[in-house]
Regions:
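ABC-type nucleotide-binding domain
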Residues: 337-607
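An intracellular "coupling" helix at the cytosolic face of ABC transporter transmembrane type-1 domains
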Residues: 22, 27-30, 118-119, 135-144, ...
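Short intracellular "coupling" helices and adjacent cytoplasmic loop segments at the cytosolic face
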Residues: 2-11, 99, 107-131, 135-137, ...
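Transmembrane helix-loop-helix hairpins at lipid-water interfaces of multipass membrane proteins
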Residues: 32-89, 166-171, 280
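Alpha-helical transmembrane segments of multi-pass membrane proteins
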Residues: 31-32, 79-98, 145, 149-156, ...
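Juxtamembrane loop-to-helix connectors within ABC transporter transmembrane domains
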Residues: 17, 25, 90, 94-98, ...
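Hydrophobic alpha-helical transmembrane segments of ABC transporter permease domains
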Residues: 37, 41, 45-49, 86, ...
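Helix-loop-helix
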Residues: 62-74, 164-178, 248-316, 320-324
């Protein structure tokens, strides 16, 4: 399991950090204001109840009088009804605010992920991105909504209780209020330590989510490698680390909360110790306030601690939202061509398919050495170009640059005679068909997956695309035909079925540039024969780059490029290269012998 080093977020409690998510909170402003007003009403009732109790003791219990008791009971009944209504509405509003904030942040995170380049996905574990999208956004929404509610009630109650205590007996009020300063100092002391531990827990949680995701998605590989024990031990190490820091967090809170309770108990004891100077009614009022006063004070302390702890989540989410895409368009390009979510297709020129590399030098963002150096290549419109070479020779790099998943560090890549950076990435991708060795299908039906090639395509066009690549007969054998569910990632279909569907999807887009990245290497012989019948028709009139694993499949290519260490060492047709008896000749004959040997062994096993 890959060990991804997350960024350390060790900033102290800072409004600047929280300011970054204010745009997501502002749409819930009215809801949060309503919550605050309701909390004022709730706090007002809570402050009034001890005074009502003191009045009852003084006028009814001590003199043993029933005079006015009916009115008191009526007032209590009304207050209970009011509190019930308040609670019903603030719970409703709190849930609205929480889900509203979480949804806004979650959508923004997902949108940012859609805009980020391939390199970000290559270096960032899925678990990290999942944690940002789910757990972090949920925690922020929860704190914003319920934090405002709890904090509002606590502040209003504290202010109201202090005013009421000074109004009833100012000396006792001073005694109770004297414990606030020690409580504030304790809160400051503990919240720094809790914040530090929580940040570590957030990082470990991301690693844990990533490891779990890797274990599930790679289940088949794990089982075939008999690596269950190794994966379990690695996951156990991560959970042990999480448990260790969770225990530290529990210890901090187990000291902090009882300490706060002790301060509250001390205030109650001081009140009782001073009872000789007051009557029973006033003592009852102050005992009520002393006992309940420290609940809101503790709430405030707890909310501040939670804000400090959740700042790590805010930092991570805002860090992702500030990630820059690997490819950044110039302003003039955006003005003319639009962006992914607001394309200006009326300004798009037709793409013809002439592609030229001129003095291109390139290294990957995390690489130290150039993969390509002063690389030159011209592929004319409609050319079927096959790329072959050993692993690591630079085949996929050429394709990545053609697709503009990355851009050259020096030199330029021309499409139809112009540097492709002068036009938008979306313009290029809309004219591009890309079929991978391991195609990805989305959850949904086969029909829906093919339609991703062109979302406005009719059912007839979807089915015609399937016929072109000979996928229609395979789909017809499935129980529900085109309405068959593909499953997550296409897991309910065979590799060959997924490959055929991905071909149909690419054809439906009617691209002018076609990329086949070892697209037939993972299919069985029968499916490969179907695909080979379709490929020549698919590539006709289109500029095509085919990274080939089986060299026998590219004999009809217009030009074959043999790549080694980022340089083209041979080029020509199959016949021309075989006559040269060079690198391509060696690769082809070696592979031919291996395939022939496998065929003989297979026939012997059948016999």
């Amino acid at each position: 399991m890959a060990d991804y080093e997350d960024i350390d977020y060790n900033k102290p409690m800072s409004f600047k950090v929280w300011k970054k998510i204010i745009p997501f909170i502002l749409p819930q402003k009215k809801t949060l204001i309503k919550c605050t007003l309701l909390m004022f009403s709730v706090a007002l009732v809570d402050v009034f109840l001890p005074i009502l109790l003191g009045y009852t003791i003084k006028n009814n219990i001590v003199p043993r009088s029933a005079e006015g008791i009916g009115l008191i009971l009526t007032v209590i009944f009304v207050l209970v009804i009011v509190q019930g209504i308040n609670v019903r509405y603030f719970v409703d509003l709190g849930i609205r605010a929480e889900t509203g904030v979480s949804r806004a942040i979650r959508n923004a995170v997902f949108l940012r992920l859609q805009k980020l380049g391939i390199f970000y996905y290559n270096k960032t574990p899925v678990g990290y991105m999942m944690a940002r999208t789910n757990s972090d956004t949920s925690r922020i929404g929860d704190l914003v909504a319920w934090g405002v509610i709890d904090f509002s009630w606590s502040v209003f109650y504290c202010i109201g209780a202090i005013i009421a205590m000074f109004f009833v007996h100012w000396r006792l009020a001073f005694i109770v209020c004297a414990t606030i300063l020690p409580l504030a100092l304790l809160t400051w002391f503990f919240q720094k330590r809790i914040l530090f531990v929580n940040r570590i827990l957030r990082k470990i949680n991301s690693k844990m989510t990533g490891a779990m995701n890797e274990g599930i998605t790679g289940a088949r590989t794990v089982k075939t490698l008999v690596a269950e024990k190794q994966c379990s031990e690695e996951y156990s190490e991560i959970t042990a680390e999480y448990r260790s820091y969770a225990k530290k967090m529990a210890k901090l809170k187990s000291v902090f909360i009882p300490t706060v309770m002790f301060v509250g108990t001390a205030a109650t004891a001081l009140t009782i110790g001073s009872s000789s100077m007051v009557d029973l009614a006033i003592l009852a009022i102050f005992l009520q306030y002393a006992a309940s006063f420290f609940e809101p004070v503790h709430n405030i302390a707890n909310i501040l601690t939670e804000f400090a702890a959740t700042q790590a989540n805010v930092e991570r989410v805002s860090g992702l939202l500030q990630q820059e895409p690997g490819i950044t368009e110039k302003n003039e390009v955006l003005e003319k061509y639009g962006d992914t979510f607001s394309p200006k297709k009326e300004n798009w020129e037709p793409l013809l398919g002439d592609i030229e590399f001129k003095g291109v030098t390139f290294k990957y963002p995390d690489g130290k050495e150039n993969v390509l150096e002063n690389f030159n290549l011209h592929v004319e419109r409609g050319t079927y170009a096959a790329i072959v070479g050993e692993t690591g020779a630079g085949k996929s790099t050429l394709v990545n640059l053609v697709c503009r998943f990355f851009e050259p560090d020096a030199g330029e890549i021309l499409i139809d005679g112009r540097d492709y950076r002068e036009r938008s990435q979306l313009w290029l991708h809309s004219n591009l068909g890309y079929v991978l060795q391991n195609p990805h299908l989305f959850s949904g039906s086969i029909r829906e997956n093919i339609r991703y090639g062109r979302l406005d395509a009719s059912d007839e066009e979807v089915e015609n695309a399937a016929k072109i690549v000979h996928a229609d007969k395979v789909i017809a054998k499935l129980k529900n035909g085109y309405d068959t569910e593909s499953g997550e990632g296409g897991d309910l279909l065979s590799t060959g079925e997924k490959q055929l569907i991905s071909f149909a999807r690419a054809i439906l887009a009617n691209p002018q540039i076609f990329i086949l990245d070892e697209a037939t290497s993972s299919v069985d012989t029968e499916t490969e024969m179907l695909l080979q019948k379709a490929i020549s028709r698919l590539l006709e009139g289109r500029t095509s780059f085919v990274i080939a694993h089986r060299l026998s499949t590219i004999r009809n290519a217009d030009i074959i490029l043999v790549v080694h260490d980022g340089k083209i060492i041979e080029r020509g047709t199959h016949t021309e290269l075989m006559k040269k008896s060079g690198v391509y000749f060696d690769l082809y004959t070696r592979q031919f012998e291996e395939e022939a040997e496998e065929k003989v062994l297979g026939e012997k096993q059948k016999a």
